[in-house]
C-alpha cells in the first residue's frame, strides 16, 4: 500500500504518509512544504535537494508563485526523462503547502501529471484551500478505505455506477456520440454530489481541530488504511508526519529516516 494525506485548517497543515521520502520542506525559514504521491517512482529526495540548490523562493513571494515555480522546475526536469518514466508518472499528484505574505491562513495547491494527445503534461497548480479558514482534506495514493470511512464511496464503486449510467443512456439514446455527451454531463453531476456528500461533514469537523487533533487523526487514518489493506492484519506504520504552521514553519514530528 502507499497512502498519504493532507489535513489543514486555519491553525496549519498536517501531512502524513506510510512511505519514506514523500514529505519535504523547502527550508527551515520558509514555511513551504511539498507532499508527493507515495506511488511515484521518481527519486524525490534527490529532486527536492536539486530544487533547493537551483531555485530560490522567498517569504515575499505569493504562495501560488512558489507552487508555480516548483511546477516549472518539474516540467523542465521531466522533459529530460525517458518516455517510459513519464508514462509511469501519469495521473500522479503533488501537493504544495505554504503561506501568502502577511496572511495568517495556510494555503494548498495540487499539481497533477497527465498523458494527453499532446504528450506528457504537468498541469498548472490548482488551489484547493479556498474554502473559509483554509479547511482542506486531500488524499494521495491508495486511500480507498479512508474514503469509505469518511462517508464517501470507493473509486471502484463510483466507476461501476458511471459505467451503468453510460450503458443505460446508450440504450435509450441509441447514439454513442450523443450518449457520451450525456455521460460527460452525468459524470460531472455525480462527482459534484460525491464531493459535497463526502466533504461537508468531514471538513466541518476538521475546521474545529487543533494541530494535535489533526496529527492524531491523520496518523490513525493512515494506519487504518494499512490495516484494512493488509492480508496478515499487520498495521502498516505511519513513516512520516510533517506540520506546517506560520509560527514554526515546517516541523517533522515523525520521520523514520532520522530514527524518530
Residue locations for each model-derived region?
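N-terminal nucleophile
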Residues: 1-260
Amino acid at each position: 500500500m502507499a497512502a498519504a494525506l493532507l489535513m489543514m485548517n486555519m491553525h496549519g497543515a498536517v501531512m502524513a504518509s506510510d512511505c519514506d521520502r514523500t514529505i519535504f520542506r523547502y527550508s527551515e525559514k520558509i514555511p513551504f512544504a511539498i507532499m508527493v504521491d507515495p506511488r511515484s517512482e521518481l527519486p524525490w529526495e534527490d529532486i527536492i535537494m536539486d530544487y533547493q540548490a537551483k531555485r530560490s523562493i522567498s517569504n515575499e513571494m505569493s504562495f501560488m508563485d512558489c507552487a508555480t515555480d516548483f511546477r516549472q522546475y518539474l516540467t523542465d526536469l521531466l522533459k529530460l526523462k525517458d518516455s517510459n518514466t513519464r508514462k509511469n508518472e501519469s495521473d500522479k499528484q503533488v501537493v504544495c503547502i505554504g503561506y501568502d505574505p502577511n496572511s495568517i491562513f495556510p494555503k494548498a495547491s495540487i499539481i497533477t501529471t497527465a498523458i494527453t494527445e499532446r504528450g506528457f503534461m504537468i498541469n498548472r497548480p490548482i488551489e484547493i484551500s479556498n474554502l473559509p479558514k483554509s479547511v482542506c482534506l486531500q488524499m494521495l495514493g491508495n486511500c480507498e478505505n479512508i474514503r469509505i470511512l469518511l462517508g464517501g464511496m470507493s473509486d471502484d464503486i463510483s466507476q461501476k455506477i458511471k459505467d451503468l449510467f453510460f450503458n443505460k443512456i446508450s440504450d435509450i439514446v441509441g447514439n454513442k456520440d450523443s450518449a457520451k455527451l450525456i455521460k460527460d454531463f452525468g459524470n460531472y453531476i455525480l462527482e459534484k454530489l460525491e464531493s459535497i456528500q463526502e466533504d461537508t461533514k468531514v471538513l466541518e469537523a476538521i475546521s474545529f481541530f487543533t494541530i494535535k487533533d489533526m496529527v492524531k487523526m491523520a496518523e490513525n487514518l493512515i494506519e487504518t488504511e494499512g490495516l484494512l489493506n493488509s492480508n496478515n492484519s499487520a498495521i502498516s506504520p505511519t513513516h512520516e508526519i510533517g506540520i506546517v504552521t506560520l509560527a514554526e514553519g515546517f516541523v517533522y514530528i515523525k520521520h523514520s529516516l532520522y530514527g524518530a
